[in-house]
Amino acid sequence: MPERYGPRVIEHLVNPRNAGEVGGPSGVGEAGNAACGDQVRFTLRVGGDLRLQEVRYRAYGCAACIAAGSALAELAEGRSITGAAQISRGDIQEALGGPLPPGKEHGATLALDALHRAFEDYWSRQGDALLGGEGLGDGSGGRRGVVAAMSGGVDSAVTALLLKERGYEVVAVTFRLHDGEPGSRSCCSPDTVLFARETAHGLGIPHFTLNLRELFDRRVMRDFVGSYAAGRTPNPCVACNAHVKFHAAAFLADRLGLRHVATGHYARVGEGPCLERPEDGRKDQTYVLWPVPPRLLGRTIFPLGDYRKSEVRRIAEERGLAVARTPESQDICFIPDGDYRSFVRRRVRSEPGEIVDRQGRVLGRHAGVVDFTVGQRRGLGISAPTPLYVTEVRPRSRQVVVGSRRELEVRRMLVRGANWFLDPREAALVQVRYNGEPVPCELEEGAGGWEVALLEPVFGVAPGQSAVFYTRDGAKVVGGGIIARRDA
């Protein structure tokens, strides 16, 4: 045995702990690849009290992987699932007598990743409860704890830090939403999951990953593609908040007996509950939070609502967080290169068609309606003496209608699928774009949804986008919905 390994490593190699397989396991996880030389596999049995009754491992490859698997299995068995989820790479190396030799540190990383994949498998076996979002409680009977969504960025890291400093029992969770690109650090990509786990362990809190690929594909990605094919302009963040992120965090909180959920959004929760704008108006994210069900909003904490972004970064720097200077992601999380047209085209067939004006005169040709959205000016492929904008997309006839900016003017719209926090009669302002200015409005409920009269014209309103209503002072969100139709 090479002398560079310490006596505890050698002890685990000569006398491995918990080697083998759990029969009928609650969860199974693997990391690495035997074809590449190193692989670790964990199987575990979780009791009704969420304690790890049995933990077994198998490891193939270098001595560091085998010893790390043995040490981790011994550390994890008998702990609560949250206690085991708090074990860090440093804890494994300490159990092995100190840092592993240079070039062998990956042994602890692989072992830890295999265990966490077993946790992930355990939660996935909850199946219907996790994917359906049904039967979620209001958290009233839970402990003073919180499941904090952690994306790998500075906002979610500081969120978890602030909650811990306020005395909450904090459990971090990262959502595996899509496969992503190798090396990508977009929100919830594979590499981000590992980075978020390192950040959580650095804060001394447990970390779990929930595999939500199926749910995210069904409720967000397919809707995204289908909307463009139907001539609408979707907002995937709204769909995720409506059907995925908050439901999944509440699912985990319920299973762990914790009262609250938290995210790094810049918003506040007021009495009612109602959604309120944050301290930092430039970072206001209430526009994408309107679909959160009131029963979930009532148990949600937004710690960053009382801070400005500059203060959040300063807190991260003062506490020595590695994410302090992480750049913000401006792209759709599952399209990190920003090329949504290529993404949609890979998933739906789009036929060529005509570009016409409002009178039906043909001005040019296009390669597919999925390339266009209302308000678009660039990429039309036609020349004109004055600027032209997309004013309508007609998927059935495969026509893209263009016109002057004035033809984008909208004074009425129909909103469907509304979610209300306050009495709709309190709605005095409406915002139709993420960074748009709210304008005065009047609402009237009809058989097909909410008819909205805009007291000031708005340009470029796109079906499929959100209409979010605010109180007269603009401070509180009354509710929101999806724009189904717009009229001049």
Swiss-Prot record:
Highest taxon of source: Bacteria
Enzyme Commission identifier(s): 2.8.1.13
Example GO BP: tRNA wobble position uridine thiolation
Region described as tRNA-specific 2-thiouridylase MnmA: 143-488
GO terms under cellular component: cytoplasm
Leader peptide range in chain numbering: none
Amino acids binding ATP: 149-156, 175, 264
Catalytic activity: S-sulfanyl-L-cysteinyl-[protein] + uridine(34) in tRNA + AH2 + ATP = 2-thiouridine(34) in tRNA + L-cysteinyl-[protein] + A + AMP + diphosphate + H(+)
Active-site annotation: 240, 333
Site (Interaction with tRNA): 265, 465
InterPro entries membership: MnmA-like, MnmA-like_C, MnmA-like_central, MnmA-like_central_sf, NIF_FeS_clus_asmbl_NifU_N, Rossmann-like_a/b/a_fold
GO molecular function: ATP binding; iron ion binding; iron-sulfur cluster binding; tRNA binding; tRNA-uridine 2-sulfurtransferase activity
Region span, Interaction with tRNA: 283-285, 433-434
Cellular location(s): Cytoplasm
Disulfide bond annotation, renumbered to this chain: 240-333
Keywords per UniProt: ATP-binding, Cytoplasm, Disulfide bond, Multifunctional enzyme, Nucleotide-binding, RNA-binding, Transferase, tRNA processing, tRNA-binding
UniProt family annotation: In the N-terminal section; belongs to the NifU family.
Name the UniProt record assigns to this protein: Bifunctional protein NifU/MnmA
Protein's organism: Rubrobacter xylanophilus (strain DSM 9941 / JCM 11954 / NBRC 16129 / PRD-1)
